């Protein structure tokens, strides 16, 4: 499992399932689960600008400096038809995004292997989520 630090508001948009691609200047061959870490610094793009450009209302305060969720990279392409795609970048195509309980954690640059303690915790939460859905009970994390 990997971990990727992303600035807010983008991290929350991903784990809420709204943003379906993550734009990067570099490609990846990795396919699989990724823990989403919200960086200590928020992006310069304001909540108002996100609402104007993309029609999505954001909370006034978002968690910083910790784990906020998990997603899955299923492809890496350039270009991509998503409204979230930034021209000239590589689009990490994301599926099965969902929030996790916030956990303070130091982030890393690039796409890195997640420490064992994070991987096992996320896999456990991930497995319970899938099991609950199969039984017809949607479980929110």
Report each predicted region and the residues it spans.
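Structured alpha/beta reader/binder surfaces that contact nucleic acids or chromatin modification marks
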Residues: 1-141
